[in-house]
Regions:
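Glycine-rich phosphate-binding loop and adjoining beta1-alpha1-beta2 segment
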Residues: 1-18
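Residue-level recognition of alpha-helix initiation/capping sites
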Residues: 5, 30, 52-53, 155
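Short glycine/serine/threonine/alanine-rich loop segments
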Residues: 19-23, 66-67
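Conserved SAM/SAH-binding loop
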Residues: 26-35
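A short, aliphatic-rich alpha-helical micro-motif
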Residues: 38-43
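E1/E1-like adenylate-forming module used to activate ubiquitin-like modifiers
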Residues: 44-147, 179-187
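Mid-domain beta-loop-alpha active-site segment that forms a flexible
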Residues: 141-164
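Phosphate-binding loop/pocket of nucleotide- and phosphate-handling active sites
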Residues: 159-187
Length: 187
């Protein structure tokens, strides 16, 4: 999928699962201009955005529209469940203040404090921290292994299903790190 826009790659994958699904592409990404159209009719938002502005605006509009949001980060299997369908839910479990949210919504670049709000650098793996430090020099973006991405997608789907079934799924951050659990079971 190198060189193929993320929206196109995902649309192709959806068509392979069920060619009768109706898919609407937003090739320009998620923007203020298309936010209301994008959110219209959604039951859940899955954040797979790379740009800080898009990540912030997804949360802003999810909260305005009362739509739960999920973000899976392949580092340590981190998964954020953000219950904007529940009253008074703060942005990213209170990790993003209203002032920081306003900054992020118009920002064109990542700042260290934005990275920390989204991934909590103190909890990131050593490999993840090294990758963050290399972005913009030897790396163009956050590296992700397919196995981690596939596992994360599965975890996100399980959470979404549980929410849709009416099970109690609180606003929270979880780490579902398989490698850590495997090492702990051996030791």
């Amino acid at each position: 999928h190198l060189g193929v826009p993320k929206a196109v790659a995902i649309a192709r994958a959806i068509a392979e699962v069920d060619p009768y699904f109706e898919v609407e592409l937003f090739t320009e990404g998620f923007t203020d201009e298309n936010a209301e159209t994008f959110m219209d009719g959604l039951d859940f938002v899955c954040d797979a955005c790379d740009q800080v502005r898009a990540k912030a605006n997804l949360r802003w509009y999810a909260k305005v529209n009362g739509i739960p949001l999920i973000m899976e980060t392949s580092d340590r299997g981190m998964i954020d469940i953000e219950r904007y369908d529940e009253a008074n839910t703060p942005f990213l479990h209170g990790r993003i203040s209203d002032d920081m949210m306003e900054e992020m919504r118009i920002s064109s670049a990542w700042k260290p404090e934005y990275f920390d709000a989204f991934i909590d650098v103190s909890q990131a793996s050593q490999r993840g921290v090294s990758s963050l430090q290399a972005i913009g020099t030897t790396l163009v973006g956050w590296p992700q292994l397919y196995t981690d991405v596939a596992a994360g997608g599965s975890h996100a789907a399980q959470v979404i299903r549980s929410v849709f079934l009416g099970e109690h799924v609180p606003d929270a951050r979880h780490y579902l790190e398989v490698n850590e659990q495997l090492l702990e079971s051996v030791n």
